[in-house]
Amino acid sequence: MKKYLALALIAPLLISCSTTKKGDTYNEAWVKDTNGFDILMGQFAHNIENIWGFKEVVIAGPKDYVKYTDQYQTRSHINFDDGTITIETIAGTEPAAHLRRAIIKTLLMGDDPSSVDLYSDVDDITISKEPFLYGQVVDNTGQPIRWEGRASNFADYLLKNRLQSRNNGLRIIYSVTINMVPNHLDKRAHKYLGMVRQASRKYGVDESLILAIMQTESSFNPYAVSRSDALGLMQVVQHTAGKDVFRSQGKSGTPSRSFLFDPASNIDTGTAYLAMLNNVYLGGIDNPTSRRYAVITAYNGGAGSVLRVFSNDKIQAANIINTMTPGDVYQTLTTRHPSAESRRYLYKVNTAQKSYRRR
């Protein structure tokens, strides 16, 4: 609610986050909430464009952490896919001071997404004794950064040696870019291995599949958000997959945003949904490999859309799949599924899962 309120407040003062919904149950409340969220995201993007200039809009997404401060004049952007951290400011006075504060805060921030509002300029980032980026970034001496003194020294080094500026026609943008360590993805994945193992045992879902879904959905970014309001490491949507899981567990309502931003809760919910897809929605598929391909695709686009690739009748669809080889099922889903995103998704997750199985 805090994020919705912040967006609603800045729109009139200043005159956007996966697009696919998990599951097939489209209800009026979900559509209303999602449409409203999408409108607010569009307003937010427009506001940023007014302040920063054309083609300078950067907004948080599944694999991008973006936090604005200083009346939206300074921003920190972590690209978890590319492994880069870019701190920028358009502050007209003392830009180096604005950058220095943002560098230190970003390097030392914790891993509690529920405490940070990515859609306001409130400086709500707290310095943590266990920084989220610890081990994923090293300073100019090759050391990981845990304490404020080392972060401050590194910030001074960056401002002296790596400060860049560019004029976009509206503003002068000052920036520094930090490269994360080459194995930053593995470093993040390691943080969640215990939670993944626990969920794997609880629901009977292969660890490698959970990790592959997490990598594909968020690149292990606990702050992950999307324009469809999918949240957290496994990009769970409250009103669809989240609601289905709660109902299966005898709980009413839907998981809260803070619940889904908690890594352990997010992994548990996402894994529970994978188990539902495997055991309930797609349980009629006999071959485990064929069923895995269907489950992966369904996690992105819904079980119904997977079955409809083969037949409009769900039972008949399962029967058709059961006459096919796993290779033919894979080929069909990656070429005939109506969603290009879902076709690519199966390829990405299957490829990632192979890499985790080899470890």
UniProtKB/Swiss-Prot annotation:
Major localisation: membrane
Subcellular location: Cell outer membrane
CDD domains membership: LT_MltC_MltE
Record GO cellular component, one term: cell outer membrane
Covalent lipid adducts (N-palmitoyl cysteine), residues: 17
Origin: domain of life: Bacteria
Lipid addition sites, S-diacylglycerol cysteine: 17
InterPro entries according to UniProt: Lysozyme-like_dom_sf (IPR023346), Murein_transglycosylaseC (IPR023664), Murein_transglycosylaseC_N (IPR024570), Transglyc_AS (IPR000189), Transglycosylase_SLT_dom_1 (IPR008258)
Record's keyword terms, sorted: Cell outer membrane, Cell wall biogenesis/degradation, Lipoprotein, Lyase, Membrane, Palmitate, Signal
SUPFAM superfamilies to which the protein is assigned, alphabetical: Lysozyme-like
Record EC number: 4.2.2.n1
GO terms, biological process: cell wall macromolecule catabolic process; cell wall organization; peptidoglycan metabolic process
Pfam families: Mltc_N, SLT
Reaction(s) catalysed by this chain's protein: Exolytic cleavage of the (1->4)-beta-glycosidic linkage between N-acetylmuramic acid (MurNAc) and N-acetylglucosamine (GlcNAc) residues in peptidoglycan, from either the reducing or the non-reducing ends of the peptidoglycan chains, with concomitant formation of a 1,6-anhydrobond in the MurNAc residue
Enzyme class: lyase
Family: Belongs to the transglycosylase Slt family.
The protein's name: Membrane-bound lytic murein transglycosylase C
Species annotation: Escherichia coli O8 (strain IAI1)
